[in-house]
Regions:
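Cofactor-/ligand-binding subdomain signature composed of acidic, glycine-rich
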Residues: 1-14, 133-201, 325-336, 344-348
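Active-site diphosphate/adenylate-binding microenvironment
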Residues: 4-8, 17, 25, 30-35, ...
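Anionic-ligand anchoring segments at beta-strand to alpha-helix junctions in alpha/beta enzyme folds, i.e.
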Residues: 17-55, 186-187, 193-271
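Structural signature of the thiamine diphosphate
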Residues: 17-18, 59-70, 75-96, 119-172, ...
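Glycine-rich beta-alpha junction loops
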Residues: 26, 99-100, 157-163, 210-212, ...
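Active-site-proximal loop->helix
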Residues: 33-35, 56, 99-121, 244-249, ...
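Short acidic-hydrophobic, aromatic-tinged amphipathic segments that line or gate anion-handling sites
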Residues: 44, 125-130, 250-254, 313-323
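Phosphate/pyrophosphate-binding active-site segments
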Residues: 132, 292-361
Length: 361
């Protein structure tokens, strides 16, 4: 078994069904090996499309999408797709071919330092230097991409490594990484603070972002909102966290959001941001968002907490687990008057349209 065969075997172990890509010399050993696999390869017109298509599949399935491209221009062409996946927290495995190991750094034909180029917008990147490391690296890559705050991982594999004989293929059953241990369970002290603030609040609201969908926490969010009568708005990435016909859902906030959703968030006295970047598209003036309200920020990525605005109660953890813990608590709160006000906004704050009669047959 050569390195290219080992790569395909790793993908099969991870139950990968599709690989998007465009062949080139430095990735040809991999494409030759995958011909004998049940994995379907999907040829794209440009490498950027491979990253976007793999990212799109990941958005639909929740599992890491995979793309494979050649070195040099093939690798640099996927950068936009990788950056998009990083910004949207989408699990993506990008496999890039590379020139012979002994030629690295010599500026040979179609050599590019792709691991250095993508450093700022991948969760991690690998340059494979030993063919026997392939099983471990792929196991780690899939684990990193699909846990914590999900995102892209790049694996750069020189052509000589793809053609080298592997001594023994053993795919690891588990990952052991001392430096990577994302927080899943939220701190119960902080969770109880959230419950305490809900009991004090008269006008609470939840703003759900894409992190709720990525953690598969829609059911828990709906149960929590319905149990305590808390209205919910979403960012653009959070669309789908609740059915649009749910009376507790008030639509998308932000520049292109619903006017009544923005007003609801502005007038709230307790704002619970869950899995959402406090970015300009959702909040045009982040420095003003905490005026006259308490901000609770829940995110699986500790780096996102307080990134754009200070939170009174920061809570690091997976949204699904945090909502489950909150549902187990007894919270004494009632917000019917607030919901009635928001229903009035929803009925009255609608755009006035004057259709042109000439468009009607």
């Amino acid at each position: 078994m050569i390195g290219a065969d080992a790569i395909v075997k790793c993908l099969e172990e991870e139950k990968v069904k599709y690989v998007f890509g465009y062949p080139g010399v430095a990735i040809c050993p991999f494409y030759n090996s995958i011909l004998d696999s049940s994995i379907e390869t999907i040829l794209v017109r440009t490498e950027q499309n491979a990253a976007h298509a793999a990212s799109g599949l990941a958005r639909v399935t929740g599992r890491p999408g995979v793309c494979a491209v050649t070195s040099g221009p093939g690798a640099t062409n996927v950068i936009t797709g990788i950056a998009t996946a990083f910004a949207d927290s989408i699990p993506l495995i990008c496999i890039t071919g590379q020139v012979n190991s002994e030629l690295l750094g010599s500026d040979v034909f179609q050599e590019a330092d792709i691991t250095g180029a993508v450093e700022s917008f991948v969760k991690y990147s690998y340059l494979v230097k030993d063919v026997n490391d392939i099983p471990r690296i792929f196991k780690e890559a899939f684990h990193i991409a699909s846990t914590g705050r999900k995102g892209p991982v790049l694996i750069d594999i020189p052509i000589d490594i793809q053609n080298a004989e592997i001594k023994k293929f053993t795919y690891p059953e588990r990952v052991s990484m001392r430096t990577y241990k994302p927080t899943v369970k939220g701190n119960m002290v902080q969770i109880k603070k959230v419950a305490s603030q809900l009991e004090k609040a008269k006008k609470p609201i939840i703003c759900a972002g894409g992190g709720v969908l990525l953690s598969d926490a829609e059911t828990e969010l709906r149960s929590f909102a319905q149990k305590y009568g808390i209205p919910v708005v979403s960012t653009m990435m959070g669309i789908g966290v609740m059915p649009t016909e749910d009376p507790l859902y008030f639509g998308m906030v932000g520049n292109n959001g619903k006017p009544y959703a923005n007003r609801a968030m502005n007038e709230s006295d307790l704002l619970i941001m869950v899995g959402a970047r406090v970015a300009d598209r959702a909040v045009s003036q982040p420095d003003l968002i905490t005026e006259n309200k308490v901000l609770i920020q829940i995110d699986v990525d500790p780096a996102e907490i307080g990134n754009n605005v200070g939170a009174a109660i920061p809570l690091v953890g997976d949204a699904k687990h945090i909502f489950r813990d909150l549902l187990e608590l007894t919270i004494d709160c009632e917000h019917q008057e607030w919901l009635t006000t928001l229903d009035t906004y929803r009925r009255t704050m609608v755009p006035k349209r004057h259709p042109d009669p000439s468009y009607v047959d």
